Amino acid sequence: MSRFPAVAGRAPRRQEEGERSRDLQEERLSAVCIADREEKGCTSQEGGTTPTFPIQKQRKKIIQAVRDNSFLIVTGNTGSGKTTQLPKYLYEAGFSQHGMIGVTQPRKVAAISVAQRVAEEMKCTLGSKVGYQVRFDDCSSKETAIKYMTDGCLLKHILGDPNLTKFSVIILDEAHERTLTTDILFGLLKKLFQEKSPNRKEHLKVVVMSATMELAKLSAFFGNCPIFDIPGRLYPVREKFCNLIGPRDRENTAYIQAIVKVTMDIHLNEMAGDILVFLTGQFEIEKSCELLFQMAESVDYDYDVQDTTLDGLLILPCYGSMTTDQQRRIFLPPPPGIRKCVISTNISATSLTIDGIRYVVDGGFVKQLNHNPRLGLDILEVVPISKSEALQRSGRAGRTSSGKCFRIYSKDFWNQCMPDHVIPEIKRTSLTSVVLTLKCLAIHDVIRFPYLDPPNERLILEALKQLYQCDAIDRSGHVTRLGLSMVEFPLPPHLTCAVIKAASLDCEDLLLPIAAMLSVENVFIRPVDPEYQKEAEQRHRELAAKAGGFNDFATLAVIFEQCKSSGAPASWCQKHWIHWRCLFSAFRVEAQLRELIRKLKQQSDFPKETFEGPKHEVLRRCLCAGYFKNVARRSVGRTFCTMDGRGSPVHIHPSSALHEQETKLEWIIFHEVLVTTKVYARIVCPIRYEWVRDLLPKLHEFNAHDLSSVARREVREDARRRWTNKENVKQLKDGISKDVLKKMQRRNDDKSISDARARFLERKQQRTQDHSDTRKETG
């Protein structure tokens, strides 16, 4: 398991007790943290301790601005107190008398940690006056006046209460991150005020908070609403371009050694102050922690370190799949004489504020979900950050004193590879789930919905196509009864479709654990240390073997069931190199899904089907009902070809139980693809062609114009003709005419496959013979 957090240096060797347990070390750090807060804090009206923030000088003005305007934009540097103090001010000014003050955050971690902080400052129990709601965790009550939540939770609120009658103020925080859900909330709130519904509260206020964003554009979107600027108190930050990455290295992320070296140089040559390092994900972070620890252990603090007050380096990782308790450690001050180094994902750039940071190391990259039009799927890719994100990162070094930011990349990389602003998620990811939500809110014309930045029409049509394939909408683009049921599930539509199919066959027990496991982060721990790596791989192979060794979906079900039935699930996870936090989340997801299925099956018109066959076949047939878009057929060697009309080549991921068994397979379905040196299918199981034969035509038989529900009278005839022609051309390019489909069906019987393979081997043998004859003649 990971050894971090850990202290490298001579400080731990000074302790008479030897190595203390991690729990005792945390207890001491917690005591230091509490004492430090009590010493530096000031008493608020609620009697808690609140540090000073720039927003405090603007308190009266900002409260009045909220009173005077339906929409208000609040901007200020990270650390100005927007997130924690403004909701308190509005509560103390009486806004909560008419409903809750709802504050959205793009990340679950931020929603929970900020709610804990505000509850502490207001001296109340978390879940009473101050609460939070995130996916699968509602820590609020009837008493709750300030509710922090993810933007997705607010969207769910709107589904049940389109007029937001339970709220007096909605605060959309971290708007500059431009998440897909936040952008949809922009449009829904604008429509709510435009339509002047008789059920809408007249006193509902909307506040949009942003650290860096195109503020004039946002103001114009909300009817030229005022912008309230909170003057910052950032100290000067010196920036240094280290020139270790240039424009030609845009796709090269093998920069960990360089980042560790820069971090170590800071520790040796700079005066006291904590370090914040930005990397893209868990693997990079854990590897960097390991390398940094090895280097820091060899330091002679009597001769190598410029600041003689330093005795060691406390190394702390920070990424999304860590437990809440693990993430809390980064906020605690280090022991005397110890420099803290937090190695984090982008979560520490805006959502979390860590005191004491004086040095920032900016790796220049971030993991980002992008839609791949060639594959028709969302792909998690490592891409350069934007200039606005880079400024956010450097600003972390100037919150409490002057600081320094070390940028790994060059100035040319800054100018040529980094966009000015974050590309909104709505312009680069799948819109399937949000389009279904809009349809369920009776917003049928999703193309002309009021978007701050309208997405590419192709993405909207792709979403409509996928919803039609799942039977969530009909041929006219109207939501079906199934679609209304699907929107209640916290799952992607295709996975929801598979779960509902299983419920109709009365075998949901087979699918629910798998759906729960697929809805949490990757459960497998893959350590960096080679020795531990071999042990982890062996344990994972054993788990796959218990599932039959030929179905990654079934492996997830085995992990779920075995962990849940063990007497000590956390210990079981540790032994098998599985993330206990992810399993714990999966247990909660499964319970929620089971309750949703129970209510669904109580409906009088819920369809019931029967199927006689072994369990493993029923499971795979149910998966086909939702995943038929992700069907692939083996083509040449170990390569598979997708059947969605694009014919994209994919390879089975090395982590799959089916890796190196490709020659035994003909047809597969997969959960997702990863793009590295190749396009990999991840979480795979074999299927039979006859299971998807009747489903594959649905990938091609649809009319984009009908599905979009565009008001036909408002579309000029020539525009409709161009649209129809474009669709016809696309179908011709993709080769998806009915004749082709019929040919495909004829090609896919066992005899045709066998004959085709024989012809391929014959041609290959002939080419080899010709090549050999040519060489002989040349010789």
Curated annotation (Swiss-Prot):
ATP binds at residues 76-83. Residues 1-28, 737-779 are annotated as: Disordered. Residues 263-442 form the Helicase C-terminal domain. Its EC number is 3.6.4.13. SUPFAM superfamilies: P-loop containing nucleoside triphosphate hydrolases (SSF52540). Pfam families: DEAD, HA2_C, HA2_N, Helicase_C, OB_NTP_bind. Keywords: ATP-binding, Helicase, Hydrolase, Nucleotide-binding. Residues 13-28 have a biased composition (Basic and acidic residues). It catalyses: ATP + H2O = ADP + phosphate + H(+). It comes from the Eukaryota. A motif (DEAH box) lies at residues 173-176. InterPro entries: DEAD-box_helicase_OB_fold, DEAD/DEAH_box_helicase_dom, DNA/RNA_helicase_DEAH_CS, HA2_WH, Helicase-assoc_dom, Helicase_ATP-bd, Helicase_C-like, P-loop_NTPase. Residues 63-231 form the Helicase ATP-binding domain. GO terms for biological process: mRNA splicing, via spliceosome. GO terms for molecular function: 3'-5' RNA helicase activity; ATP binding; ATP hydrolysis activity; RNA binding. Ubiquitously expressed. Belongs to the DEAD box helicase family. DEAH subfamily. Probable ATP-dependent RNA helicase. This is Probable ATP-dependent RNA helicase DHX40.
